Structure formats: structure tokens, C-alpha cells
């Protein structure tokens, strides 16, 4: 069996957070592959070449309604790439419960609602799910306590999903980007900090992250399941330091 063969049919794909920079790039990559794509987002559509459906991932009824509309438009569902989420910065000692719960409601519970809804629609024919998290769920960064907890929780959930859904031919993986260009790093100081911390000496391009998301839903990744794939230039596994130079 050749697992590197191209996809034999047009896949029917849903991208949540598709109006954002990364989600929009993922949609472009899926369309280039030949997929039929629907965009789900809380914000207005950014493009007219795919159907767009309003969704609030913090509301279960909204998620179910959006998926019903999208799967009706696509006439089925093969692929879910969940890229919806929010990020806020607050030092641990200043973080209050309301802010923490708000991030969990969107990032963790939102991912649960979306993934469970999609999984139920995939039970008969199988499917491929990619949940977009962040390397913040794997490393400690100042001010990201609630965000890191929410994203780390999604990764743990995905592993259990992979274990439970494999018998239904549903693969579940996690994509954990590091710092990404394309309008996602408006603070030049923050951007430079990530560049300095990254062994690759730069941040990721949107297309690089979208390419990995697309790969994880391809036939070539048919034996990849329950994994967290970091797209971060090595920052989560390689620590940069300047080796002292001995005086001459």
C-alpha cells in the first residue's frame, strides 16, 4: 500500500477560525489541494470563494447549527481543522477567575464542542481532525498562564480522542505553531524576541503552518494519529544560548 498516494477524491473540509490570518491561509491550502471547503467563524467572511457560516464556539447550540449548515452545503464532512481561538496576556498573580474561565470557554471547551460535533458526523465514514493549539501549551512564557492551560488541555483531549475514535477510522492530531508572521505579531519587540529565541532565526510564515495542517489531513499522513506537531523552528525543543568565547 502506498501511503504517499495523492488524495483519490475531493475532500469535504471545514475550517473554524477561517476568517483569521492562519485559518484563511489554511483554506487557501485546502482549496489548492482540491478540497471543497466551508469556513466557520465568529467574524465576517474575508473571502467569497467558500461558503461562510457564523459560529460562536463558546455556545454549543451555535456550533451544532453551524455544522449542520456547513455539512449540508458540502454534502458531508471528511476533514475538520479547528483554528478558532483567542489569546490574552495577564501575569499569573494578576489573573482573575473570570478571565481564566473566558479563555477556557473559547479555547478548551470550544475545541471540545467543535471536535465532538465533527466526530459524530464522521462516525460512519471516518475522517481527519486537526486541532490547532500553540507551543504555549508546551513551554512556559510570561503572561500566558490561562492561554497555556487552555491549549495544553486541547492537546491532552486530542490524545484521548485519538485513542477512542481510531476504531471509527477518525484520526486526530494537534498542530502547535510557534510565532507566526502575517499580521499575527503586531508588536515588533515581541516579534524580535521570538526571532532571537528561535534556532531558525525567524518566525514562521503562514503558508508553512497551513502546509503542515494540510499534510496532516492527507493520505500521506494516514498513519499519524494522536500526535502534537510543533511548527516553531525548534524553539520548543532547542534552547538557544551564546557559548562564551575564550579570550585569546
Where are these regions (language model features)?
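Short C-terminal tail/terminal secondary-structure segment
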Residues: 2-4, 139, 225-248
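Active-site loop immediately N-terminal to the catalytic Tyr-X3-Lys motif
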Residues: 93, 139-145, 167, 201, ...
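Substrate-binding pocket helix/loop in short-chain dehydrogenase/reductase
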Residues: 91-92, 99-101, 194
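Active-site helix of classical SDR
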Residues: 115, 150, 158
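Residue(s) in the substrate-gating loop at a strand-loop-helix junction
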Residues: 134
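C-terminal substrate-recognition "lid" of short-chain dehydrogenase/reductases
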Residues: 170, 203-231, 236-237
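Alpha-helical segment proximal to the catalytic Tyr-Lys
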Residues: 120, 163-167, 222
Amino acid at each position: 500500500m502506498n501511503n504517499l498516494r495523492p488524495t483519490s477524491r475531493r475532500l469535504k473540509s471545514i475550517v473554524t477560525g477561517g476568517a483569521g490570518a492562519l485559518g484563511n491561509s489554511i483554506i487557501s491550502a485546502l482549496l489548492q489541494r482540491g478540497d471543497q471547503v466551508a469556513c466557520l467563524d465568529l467574524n465576517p467572511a474575508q473571502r467569497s470563494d467558500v461558503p461562510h457560516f457564523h459560529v460562536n464556539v463558546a455556545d454549543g447550540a451555535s456550533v451544532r447549527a453551524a455544522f449542520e449548515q456547513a455539512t449540508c452545503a458540502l454534502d458531508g464532512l471528511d476533514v475538520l481543522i479547528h483554528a478558532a481561538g483567542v489569546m490574552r496576556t495577564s501575569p499569573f498573580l494578576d489573573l482573575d477567575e473570570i478571565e481564566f474561565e473566558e479563555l477556557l470557554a473559547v479555547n478548551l471547551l470550544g475545541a471540545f464542542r467543535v471536535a465532538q460535533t465533527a466526530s459524530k458526523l464522521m462516525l460512519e465514514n471516518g475522517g481527519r481532525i486537526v486541532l490547532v493549539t500553540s507551543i504555549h501549551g508546551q513551554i512556559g512564557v510570561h503572561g500566558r498562564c490561562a492561554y497555556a492551560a487552555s491549549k495544553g488541555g486541547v492537546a491532552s483531549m486530542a490524545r484521548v480522542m485519538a485513542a477512542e475514535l481510531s476504531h471509527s477510522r477518525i484520526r486526530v492530531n494537534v498542530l502547535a505553531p510557534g510565532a507566526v508572521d502575517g499580521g499575527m505579531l503586531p508588536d515588533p519587540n515581541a516579534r524580535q524576541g521570538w526571532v532571537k529565541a528561535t534556532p531558525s532565526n525567524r518566525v514562521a510564515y503562514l503558508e508553512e503552518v497551513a502546509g503542515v495542517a494540510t499534510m496532516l489531513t492527507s493520505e500521506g499522513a494516514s498513519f499519524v494519529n494522536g500526535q502534537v506537531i510543533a511548527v516553531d523552528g525548534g524553539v520548543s525543543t532547542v534552547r538557544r544560548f551564546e557559548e562564551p568565547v575564550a579570550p585569546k
